[in-house]
Amino acid sequence: MSTNKKVQSPKEESIAKMLICKVHIGTKNLENKMKRYVYTRAKDGVHILNLAKTYEKLQLAARIIVAINNPADVVVVSARPFGSRAVLKFAQYTGAQAIAGRWTPGMLTNQIIQKFTEPRLLIVTDPRTDAQPVKESAYANIPVIALCDSDSPLEHVDIAIPCNNKGKESIALMYWLLAQEVLYLKGTLPRSKPWNVMVDMFLWRDPEQFELKNLAIEETAPAAPHLTENQFATEAPYEEWNKKEEWNDNANEEWKNPIAAEEW
């Protein structure tokens, strides 16, 4: 009996990971310009995205990123908390600039502010939550790559990567695949070897979970031995308590003589 396992192509392997991370799950609402990326509609009304087109747009986005000579000219933005860790890790491995959290208005248009920047490419996690940088990029003539769900507006978006941009697993995998493809195209990572960085490194982690975990560890840890008051106290020997001292002139004879200058 043959036990040979079929070797998956890079495309099949990537799509299999997308299915596990629910990248294909869209929303019940559908933007008119996103119809081309929808495969079907489930019975519960949720639109299912075409992962073949997701993979194609992912490859196209990676080639655009590699075409920019200076990686620092690429800005990755995520106002959504689930994408904050993913954009930071993407910037770490590709050399791009990451802006996680609130976007300061005017960063692309107002030259007076301290955080003013002039990137050549903008990558956003969600065109709806990151509407401010997308709008400013249109004024500054900066191309935009966006992770777009079935209900995402495509205004001022040049490259739309259809995917689930609301789940933390989906966002982490998309930035992981994009970073991996960028490293492949740059030659930093050979295609014959798998990337030793796990997708979990791009996954968002709730700080409250760490606090609860630390509290659970403290509760289960063995308590320190309790010491009684008698163990803290140190008693002097009985002889010292009943020892009689002389407080006459003979006992204080050494204090009467003045100190010589040589002793100083």
UniProtKB/Swiss-Prot annotation:
Keyword rRNA-binding: no
Gene3D superfamilies: Glucose-6-phosphate isomerase like protein, domain 1
Major localization class: cytoplasm
A single Gene Ontology CC term: cytosolic small ribosomal subunit
PROSITE patterns in alphabetical order: RIBOSOMAL_S2_1, RIBOSOMAL_S2_2
Family annotation (CDD domains): RPS2
GO terms of molecular function: structural constituent of ribosome
Compartment annotation: Cytoplasm
The keyword Ribosomal protein is assigned to this record: yes
Keywords: Cytoplasm, Ribonucleoprotein, Ribosomal protein
GO biological process: ribosomal small subunit assembly; translation
Signal peptide: none
Pfam families: Ribosomal_S2
Function: Required for the assembly and/or stability of the 40S ribosomal subunit. Required for the processing of the 20S rRNA-precursor to mature 18S rRNA in a late step of the maturation of 40S ribosomal subunits.
Quaternary structure note: Component of the small ribosomal subunit. Mature ribosomes consist of a small (40S) and a large (60S) subunit. The 40S subunit contains about 33 different proteins and 1 molecule of RNA (18S). The 60S subunit contains about 49 different proteins and 3 molecules of RNA (25S, 5.8S and 5S). Interacts with ribosomal protein S21.
Family, similarity comment: Belongs to the universal ribosomal protein uS2 family.
Protein name (database record): Small ribosomal subunit protein uS2
